[in-house]
């Protein structure tokens, strides 16, 4: 009989081995041998195991700082190699043990330790020759059971290293079977957890080549992910390996299958698809944990791969706002872990543009462009004759020219449409021109259309900004040529067709514009509401107002806008409409009023305009747009109240002295101009959301004001000054700094014979918006026709205003050229007067019912 101490130390050794407390094992083994000499074999075996696994544990900790591709791509690298100076003595000790006197359990343990020694020595043939098999061996949650699992997993690694993939896969399946049959709890023994983790990570990796179907692989990955979700991993590296395989699989499935594919209805695939945001974010967090300091060159590999996979998945799924913001924050974390990783900033540009953070996208783009330029300079130096002097330059991940062009095309639209930055547009144009020349990209059919299209957008914007007629004409020709070259290679490029049609229409080539926009709508009838709006305005140029109204009605039917029911209710289905589509519908409603006015007169238009307000409230979920206002101490925010919506008819009953905010259709506060504070590039999730909702709220507010201004204009034309004033008060409540409020108020005062007051209001309007051609022309007309002040001074100022107007945004406004002709006539310059009169007539013959600038967005994503 052995003493109680012997039994105690035997249990202690078992417990210590299962817990992986390798430093304590030598002392426990010594005491066990002292009290029970018959346990000498297992004691020596335990000490060999402790020495070996202590070295492995230390090496695994170093892996976090050297996360190399071979570590994850080669499964056997998950067990690090150890120097022979460390392992040879251990193997000699193992060989010296008298295995003949060992029990069956001790023999199993010896085999597992021998396998581990062969693996760390990279003696894979010797490991395979052991011909280990777990078949028929009962499994228990003891040190022997752990060794059985360990030997099975190591045999799989050895077979894989010898290119016996099928045998390796069968071994790892056996290991998974052992784990599943054992029904291991959520908190297994630490050493058992280590080998379970490794088994599942190998299972996930080997599924790449071993599975006969994508569905089978999805099932395996789901099983592996479920294990790591339910169990706390001892080594996060194994969880990282599994997550990486799941992300790669999901990206492949999404990229190679359409959204309606049947594969997404299968349970395991559906589960991965529905949980992709959490999978991606968890994997990104693991990468951050495994990268403890900034990495450069090849060590960026996994971060760069993650960015590419996450971006591809995002592109091929529903791009929800919250998920996009989470990805942005993850990328910002990676900027502190990677060095010169262009892909981070490339994806940031896409994500930030999607959530409409255009200024921040611009900052990311500037960094991206800087890194691209520097990396290409490095490559150029390395490929030069003096490359040897630059041998210290670390390798970097350089974006392909095609990727650079794609990012530039996105930012070209941002700078042209949203930031209105001519300098940046010119810089991008120069940059892509240089890249196209350096890499001869115009000969590549996969990228040349995008280059031509981006150039077309640049020249269109330059055309719009030009204040020199000859320069404007040159930019027009260049933009048309660029779009045409794009369409030669991609005849059905809808965005290019739209941009070309817009360019023709703005240049008053109406026939060409109509031909192109009809071609666009044949390719895709539901391309955009703006494209139909463009066709309507083109039709109105030839005074086909009834046809334009019919087109608008057909658009309403196509996009789900139904007529008012007999009981006054409206049936609307807008579930598939984006926010921009809804905004475009509102502008289309205003154009419908303009067409009615041109076709049937002002009074007939007044009878239908109340429907516009009702539709407006139906198009937008007004309760969704809560916006904070600055500048009011007693009222910091207001709610868009659906219940307070009133028709325009009710405004007819408002007396002219009403100054309070009662009766406002949307109940916006009096002061709606907002001053956006400067924010850091890494905003909180709530900050992004607040800014996004604020922009949306301001847009809805702007459209609401636009409707009131339209109503005020109609009332003025009908001679209803009181109703016009009431409508203007409503518009002023929304934004008291709106130039058109003062413009229409000025026209109202002039209509009442109050010339001085009217002039002052027009002067304020011009001060607030000196670039608005209609305001400038109205002020010039007032100066020329007014009876106050010296005629020569009034004429000189009118001349200056009209000169600026006709050179810039009012070059195509007939009224501006008419009053310019009047000035020349008064000055006796009949030649210039005749030219201006003639140009006025030409423009009037092709004048739409509303200006082209009402078509927004002017530039679609290239």
UniProtKB/Swiss-Prot annotation:
The keyword Electron transport does not apply. The modification Phosphoserine is found at residues 632-633, 637. InterPro entries: Endocytosis_PI4K-reg_protein, TPR-like_helical_dom_sf, TPR_rpt. TPR repeats lie at residues 342-377, 460-493, 494-527, 665-698, 705-738, 740-772, 814-847. It comes from the Eukaryota. Disulfide bonds: none annotated. It is found in: Cytoplasm. Keywords: Cytoplasm, Phosphoprotein, Repeat, TPR repeat. CDD domains: YPP1. Involved in endocytosis. Belongs to the YPP1 family. This is Putative cargo-transport protein ypp1. It comes from Schizosaccharomyces pombe (strain 972 / ATCC 24843). The gene is ypp1.
């Amino acid at each position: 009989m052995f003493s109680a101490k012997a039994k105690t130390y035997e249990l202690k050794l078992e417990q210590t081995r299962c817990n992986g407390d390798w430093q304590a094992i030598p002392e426990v083994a010594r005491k066990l041998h002292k009290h029970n000499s018959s346990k000498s074999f297992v004691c020596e075996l335990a000490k060999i195991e402790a020495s070996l696994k202590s070295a492995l544990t230390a090496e695994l900790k170093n892996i976090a700082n050297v996360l190399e591709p071979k570590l994850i791509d080669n499964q056997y690298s998950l067990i690090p190699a150890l120097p022979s100076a460390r392992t040879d003595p251990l193997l000699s000790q193992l060989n010296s043990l008298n295995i003949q006197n060992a029990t069956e359990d001790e023999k199993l343990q010896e085999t597992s330790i021998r396998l581990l020694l062969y693996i760390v020595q990279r003696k894979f043939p010797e490991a395979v020759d052991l011909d280990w098999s777990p078949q028929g061996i009962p499994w228990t949650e003891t040190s022997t059971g752990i060794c059985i699992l360990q030997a099975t997993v190591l045999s799989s690694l050895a077979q894989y290293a010898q290119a016996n993939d099928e045998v390796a896969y069968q071994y790892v399946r056996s290991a998974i079977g052992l784990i599943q049959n054992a029904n291991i709890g959520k908190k297994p023994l630490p050493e058992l957890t280590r080998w379970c983790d490794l088994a599942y990570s190998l299972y996930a990796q080997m599924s790449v080549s071993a599975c006969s179907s994508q569905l089978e692989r999805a099932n395996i990955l789901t099983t592996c992910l479920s294990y790591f979700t339910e169990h706390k991993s001892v080594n996060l590296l194994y969880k990282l390996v599994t997550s990486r395989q799941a992300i790669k699989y999901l990206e492949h499935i999404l990229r190679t299958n359409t959204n309606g594919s049947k594969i997404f209805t299968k349970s395991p695939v559906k589960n991965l698809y529905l949980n992709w945001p959490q999978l991606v974010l968890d994997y990104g967090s693991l990468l951050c944990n495994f990268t403890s300091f900034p990495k450069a060159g090849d060590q960026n590999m996994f971060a760069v791969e993650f960015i590419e996979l996450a971006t591809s998945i995002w592109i091929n799924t529903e791009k929800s706002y919250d998920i996009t913001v989470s990805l942005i924050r993850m990328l910002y974390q990676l900027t502190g872990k990677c060095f010169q990783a262009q892909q981070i900033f490339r994806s940031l540009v896409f994500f930030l543009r999607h959530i409409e953070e255009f200024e921040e996208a611009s900052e990311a783009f500037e960094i991206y462009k800087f890194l691209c330029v520097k990396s290409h300079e490095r490559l150029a130096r390395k490929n030069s004759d003096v490359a040897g002097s630059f041998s210290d330059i670390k390798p970097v991940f350089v974006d392909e020219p095609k990727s650079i062009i794609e990012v530039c095309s996105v930012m070209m639209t941002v700078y042209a449409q949203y930031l209105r930055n001519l300098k940046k547009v010119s810089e991008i144009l120069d940059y892509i021109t240089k890249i196209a020349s350096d890499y001869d990209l115009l000969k590549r059919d996969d990228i040349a259309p995008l280059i031509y299209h981006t150039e077309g957008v640049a020249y269109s914007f330059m055309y719009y900004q030009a204040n020199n007629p000859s320069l404007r004409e040159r930019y027009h020709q260049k933009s048309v040529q660029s779009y045409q070259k794009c369409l030669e290679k991609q005849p059905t490029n809808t965005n290019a067709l739209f941009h070309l049609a817009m360019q023709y229409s703005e240049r008053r080539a109406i026939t060409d514009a109509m031909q192109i926009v009809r071609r666009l709508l044949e390719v895709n009838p539901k391309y955009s509401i703006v494209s139909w709006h463009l066709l309507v305005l083109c039709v109105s140029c030839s005074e086909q107002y009834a046809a334009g109204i019919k087109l608008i009605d057909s658009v309403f039917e196509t996009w789900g806008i139904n007529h008012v029911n007999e009981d006054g209710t409206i049936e609307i289905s807008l579930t598939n409409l984006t926010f921009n589509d809804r905004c475009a519908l509102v502008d289309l409603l205003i154009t419908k009023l303009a067409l009615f006015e041109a076709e049937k007169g002002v009074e007939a238009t007044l009878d239908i305009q109340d429907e516009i307000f009702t539709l407006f409230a139906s198009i937008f979920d007004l309760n969704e747009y809560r916006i904070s206002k600055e500048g009011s101490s007693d009222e910091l925010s207001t709610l868009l109240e659906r219940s307070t919506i009133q028709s325009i008819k009710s405004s007819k009953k408002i007396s002219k002295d009403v100054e309070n905010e009662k009766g406002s259709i949307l109940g916006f506060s009096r002061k709606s101009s907002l001053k956006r504070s400067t924010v850091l590039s890494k905003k909180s999730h709530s900050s992004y959301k607040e800014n996004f909702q604020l922009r949306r709220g301001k847009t809805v507010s702007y459209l609401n004001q636009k409707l009131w201004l339209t109503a005020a204009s109609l009332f003025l034309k009908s001679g209803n000054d009181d109703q016009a004033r009431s409508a203007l008060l409503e518009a002023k409540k929304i934004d008291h700094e709106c130039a058109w409020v003062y413009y229409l108020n000025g026209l109202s005062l002039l209509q009442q014979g109050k010339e001085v007051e009217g002039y002052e209001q027009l002067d304020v309007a011009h001060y607030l918006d000196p670039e608005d051609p209609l305001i400038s022309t109205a002020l010039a007309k007032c100066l020329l026709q007014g009876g106050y002040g010296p005629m020569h001074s009034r004429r000189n100022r009118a001349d200056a205003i009209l000169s600026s107007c006709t050179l810039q945004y009012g070059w195509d406004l007939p009224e501006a050229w008419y009053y310019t002709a009047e000035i020349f006539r008064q000055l006796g310059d009949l030649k210039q007067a005749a030219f201006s009169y003639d140009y006025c007539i030409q423009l009037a013959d092709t004048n739409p019912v509303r200006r082209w600038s009402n078509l927004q967005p002017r530039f679609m994503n290239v």
